[in-house]
Amino acid sequence: NEMYRVLKKDALMVSFYGWNRVDRFMAAWKNAGFSVVGHLVFTKTYTSKAAYVGYRHECAYILAKGRPALPQKPLPDVLGWKYSGNRHHPTEKPVTSLQPLIESFTHPNAIVLDPFAGSGSTCVAALQSGRRYIGIELLEQYHRAGQQRLAAVQRAMQQGAANDNW
């Protein structure tokens, strides 16, 4: 309910979910007032958590509050998920997978909220997309990793290109 409360009117939320809990997620989203307006599948080139099957995808629902404007360039419903090699967090999302979502579903200078920020991938993607961000993380080790990561990205963005003075 809190996500629905803080989300602006006529806005979208993207929620990643575990396939084995989709019924609980769906009930919670609908009880909060969200409408499900899309589903995304991210294909991986590697397998995670192989038990009965090796999982090579991640999924997310696109949820709406009100009637958000349609994106100028709609995304395909199947997107890539490139492993970055960064292991700041056990369920880290690649910035390259999050950035298209942010750029498609928000406008420049909008605020992107990640209430489960982990090591800050969503915040990095928002920053690199010209959006403001709020990241919330309860575990100190991931909060610290996220702060360090964002500071490094901000430093890199403030530095000029190597050929700026030519």
Where are these regions (language model features)?
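S-adenosyl-L-methionine
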Residues: Q147-W166
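Core catalytic lobe of class I
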Residues: N1-R144
